[in-house]
Amino acid sequence: QQWPRDPAPIPP
């Protein structure tokens, strides 16, 4: 299993 990647930054 691949390590969960960081969530994408939420635009303003």
Swiss-Prot record:
The keyword rRNA processing does not apply. The keyword Secreted applies. The modification Pyrrolidone carboxylic acid is found at Q1. GO terms for molecular function: peptidase inhibitor activity; toxin activity. Expressed by the venom gland. GO terms for cellular component: extracellular region. Belongs to the bradykinin-potentiating peptide family. This peptide both inhibits the activity of the angiotensin-converting enzyme (ACE) and enhances the action of bradykinin by inhibiting the peptidases that inactivate it. It acts as an indirect hypotensive agent. This is Bradykinin-potentiating peptide 12a. It comes from Bothrops atrox (Barba amarilla).
